[in-house]
Curated annotation (Swiss-Prot):
Regulation of its activity: Novel PKCs (PRKCD, PRKCE, PRKCH and PRKCQ) are calcium-insensitive, but activated by diacylglycerol (DAG) and phosphatidylserine. Three specific sites; Thr-538 (activation loop of the kinase domain), Ser-676 (turn motif) and Ser-695 (hydrophobic region), need to be phosphorylated for its full activation. Inhibited by PRKCH upstream open reading frame 2.
Domain comment quoted from the record: The C1 domain, containing the phorbol ester/DAG-type region 1 (C1A) and 2 (C1B), is the diacylglycerol sensor and the C2 domain is a non-calcium binding domain.
SMART domains named among the record's database cross-references: C1, S_TK_X, S_TKc
Residues recorded as bearing Phosphotyrosine in the entry: Y90
Protein modification: Autophosphorylation at Thr-219 is required for targeting to the TCR and cellular function of PRKCQ upon antigen receptor ligation. Following TCR stimulation, phosphorylated at Tyr-90 and Ser-685.
PROSITE patterns: AGC_KINASE_CTER, C2, PROTEIN_KINASE_ATP, PROTEIN_KINASE_DOM, PROTEIN_KINASE_ST, ZF_DAG_PE_1, ZF_DAG_PE_2
Protein name: Protein kinase C theta type
Expression across tissues: Expressed in skeletal muscle, T-cells, megakaryoblastic cells and platelets.
Record's subunit section: Part of a lipid raft complex composed at least of BCL10, CARD11, MALT1 and IKBKB. Interacts with GLRX3 (via N-terminus). Interacts with ECT2. Interacts with CCDC88A/GIV; the interaction leads to phosphorylation of CCDC88A and inhibition of its guanine nucleotide exchange factor activity. Interacts with PRKCH upstream open reading frame 2; the interaction leads to inhibition of kinase activity. Interacts with CD28.
Residues found modified as Phosphothreonine: T219, T538
UniProt-listed CDD domains: C1_nPKC_theta-like_rpt1, C1_nPKC_theta-like_rpt2, STKc_nPKC_theta
Keyword list, A-Z: ATP-binding, Cell membrane, Cytoplasm, Immunity, Inflammatory response, Kinase, Magnesium, Membrane, Metal-binding, Nucleotide-binding, Phosphoprotein, Repeat, Serine/threonine-protein kinase, Transferase, Zinc, Zinc-finger
Source organism (scientific name): Homo sapiens (Human)
Length: 706
């Protein structure tokens, strides 16, 4: 292993150097790399390689050895020496390592002046050299776990674009004019007009958004029959006591002329909010919405009575054959689309649904005693905490009845609700219930809930994840990386065949079982119903793995999974990320514009596969166009045997027992395994019907319990 720095010099500023005054100097730089040696005369630096003269804004490479320094001399056309400085390469590499492999600094020159230097850290391996001290000192980009991000869910109501928002100051709802309580994301705020509301008041909004272009066009053409247009008569007002804006909900600041007051209805608003206020002068949105809801429910009841009357009297205008007329028509049929794809869905007392339309099915329900089974967290012993985040915690748990070990993911309902992730949680449950059909997806046994938490009971994979293993060996050899890549391909293609885009493929989400086979985990970012030409445009994923089409705001499909697969394969083979940046802005620019660095020692087939996966035109990317299984890197793979797990993995994790936790990060294992406390006020005010269809039981768990 021979690490090196790729260095660029630019923006030389001579300052007030006397040598530069008068005529144009046209400075250029000379770079001398010197080695530290011991001699008879003591310690000294000797130049062994020729002097380099890199042009401004170009790059050159310098290998890193302890004691090696780089002397930079700035010269001029008519001046022998303007300025100089000396940089220790080892210290520069350490600085790069702390900044995700890249740094940018201003070098102060002597006697005067400065220049901008960019440096990027790389690894270079030859087949004959062993890994040296730089591995043990951590010169790798993959030194920490990276969390996923997701664009806030947008609720489109009357052209408003409401997103869950944290209000840092006291805020009042613009619909009911009551205080918005809470500690996290207390309510919704429109991204267009800044209107603030309670989450519970989102169905009571009757005014169309004033900041939406769609609204202005619809208003122009009078497309909606129901329309209210009562303009306010605002005038500047001096408030003598603290007053809140009735549009954005925040305080009116200032000592005088703090805001505007409507002469007719007394509404108070900021100056900046005046143009965003809807024309609802004198109208109570809450009462109006309740009246409209009552009218709608009355109309629905009338339609239902009319429908029942038609069923009782029979069809009048259409003649039907006697055989059809005489058939008994049930008053209500179960909806096939709401049945679980497999297993048995059972409902806890919190989930009980309206049974007014229940039709008994004796033939189907004859032998289904498991419907009465209700699991609870007290049926398990929590031994260790395997991980945690803002969402909740993951525990190693033992089922008391059978002494079998499971991984239980516990989500906090208040956090799920505050982050607007109810639908994501339901998607994760549906994908996990489907995962039993494939060997390389994490299998779920059941889900259940309490008033405060949601629980996923999944198989315990004690081999750890790929991020844990790559931190100890820094990179995988070609055969091991190829094996993992092939199994991941099978898992991804199964998800895609079911219309599911995964969107969060990374080392952290690839687990190993006790035999060394991979399992794809964590389906919270998945997007369903993506068959055919269907596309979506949600901004989500882990920053290092996000595809360029997501960053550009384009609509996308499963092509983004193949880009993420390329990043993951690059990290497995090379041991660092293909794209770098000191912050997300630089990283995203690198993903959109930069070409990854491929070391000389990388196998030709591996490089070819990576190049085809990093194509920025989604429709031309391998996996979207062409069969990725036919790539030369996988020519030794028998795909049928691989899917049947008949090929032995090249690496088998060290597992001492079914409950062994040695392959997980130690930072969590020492913590006491207990559930987090929830926001009681929020839990008590929460509509539990949002989680009504969460509970599920797989036939595998059914057999264990019975």
């Amino acid at each position: 292993m021979s690490p090196f720095l790729r260095i660029g010099l630019s923006n030389f500023d001579c300052g007030s150097c006397q040598s530069c005054q008068g005529e144009a100097v046209n400075p250029y730089c000379a770079v001398l790399v010197k080695e530290y040696v011991e001699s008879e005369n003591g310690q000294m630096y000797i130049q062994k390689k020729p002097t380099m003269y890199p042009p401004w804004d170009s790059t050159f490479d310098a290998h890193i050895n302890k004691g090696r320094v780089m002397q930079i001399i700035v010269k001029g056309k008519n001046v022998d020496l303007i300025s100089e400085t000396t940089v220790e390469l080892y210290s520069l590499a350490e600085r790069c390592r702390k900044n995700n492999g890249k740094t940018e600094i201003w070098l102060e020159l002597k006697p005067q002046g400065r220049m901008l230097m960019n440096a990027r850290y790389f690894l270079e391996m030859s087949d004959t050299k062993d890994m040296n001290e730089f591995e043990t000192e951590g010169f790798f980009a993959l030194h920490q776990r990276r969390g996923a991000i997701k664009q806030a869910k947008v609720h489109h109501v009357k052209c408003h674009e409401f997103t869950a928002t944290f209000f840092p100051q006291p805020t009042f709802c613009s619909v009911c004019h009551e205080f918005v309580w809470g500690l996290n994301k207390q309510g919704y705020q429109c991204r267009q007009c800044n209107a603030a509301i309670h989450k519970k008041c989102i169905d009571k909004v009757i005014a169309k958004c004033t900041g939406s272009a769609i609204n202005s066009r619809e208003t122009m053409f009078h497309k909606e029959r129901f329309k209210i247009d009562m303009p306010h008569r605002f005038k500047v007002y001096n408030y003598k006591s603290p007053t809140f804006c009735e549009h954005c909900g925040t305080l009116l600041w200032g000592l005088a002329r703090q805001g505007l007051k409507c002469d007719a209805c007394g509404m108070n608003v900021h100056h900046r909010c005046q143009t965003k206020v809807a024309n609802l002068c004198g109208i109570n949105q809450k009462l109006m919405a309740e009246a409209l809801a009552m009218i709608e429910s009355t109309q629905q009841a009338r339609c239902l009575r009319d429908t029942e009357q038609i069923f009782r009297e029979g069809p009048v205008e259409i003649g039907l054959p006697c055989s059809i007329k005489n058939e008994a028509r049930p008053p209500c049929l179960p909806t096939p689309g709401k049945r679980e794809p497999q297993g048995i869905s059972w409902e806890s007392p919190l989930d009980e649904v309206d049974k007014m339309c229940h039709l008994p099915e004796p033939e189907l329900n004859k032998e289904r005693p498991s419907l009465q089974i209700k699991l609870k967290i007290e049926d398990f012993i929590l031994h260790k905490m395997l991980g945690k985040g803002s969402f909740g915690k993951v525990f190693l748990a033992e089922f008391k009845k059978t002494n079998q070990f499971f991984a239980i993911k516990a989500l906090k309902k208040d956090v799920v609700l505050m982050d607007d992730d109810v639908e994501c949680t339901m998607v994760e449950k549906r994908v996990l219930s489907l995962a039993w059909e494939h060997p390389f997806l994490t299998h779920m046994f059941c889900t259940f809930q309490t008033k405060e938490n949601l629980f996923f009971v999944m198989e315990y994979l004690n081999g750890g994840d790929l991020m844990y293993h790559i931190q100890s060996c820094h990179k995988f050899d070609l055969s091991r990386a190829t094996f993992y890549a092939a199994e991941i391909i099978l898992g991804l293609q199964f998800l895609h065949s079911k219309g599911i885009v995964y969107r969060d493929l990374k080392l952290d989400n690839i687990l190993l079982d006790k035999d060394g086979h991979i399992k794809i985990a964590d389906f919270g970012m998945c997007k369903e119903n993506m068959l055919g030409d269907a596309k979506t445009n949600t901004f989500c994923g882990t920053p290092d793995y996000i595809a360029p089409e997501i960053l550009l705001g384009q609509k996308y499909n499963h092509s983004v999974d193949w880009w993420s697969f390329g990043v993951l394969l690059y990290e497995m083979l090379i041991g660092q990320s293909p794209f770098h940046g000191q912050d997300e802005e630089e990283l995203f620019h690198s993903i959109r514009m930069d070409n990854p660095f491929y070391p000389r020692w990388l196998e030709k087939e591996a490089k070819d596969l990576l190049v085809k996966l990093f194509v920025r035109e989604p429709e031309k990317r391998l996996g979207v166009r062409g069969d990725i299984r036919q790539h030369p890197l996988f020519r030794e793979i028998n795909w049928e045997e691989l899917e049947r797990k008949e090929i032995d993995p090249p690496f088998r994790p060290k597992v001492k027992s079914p409950f062994d936790c040695s392959n997980f990060d130690k930072e969590f294992l020492n913590e006491k395994p207990r559930l987090s406390f929830a926001d009681r006020a929020l839990i008590n005010s929460m509509d539990q019907n949002m989680f009504r269809n969460f509970s599920f039981m797989n036939p595998g768990m059914e057999r264990l319990i019975s």
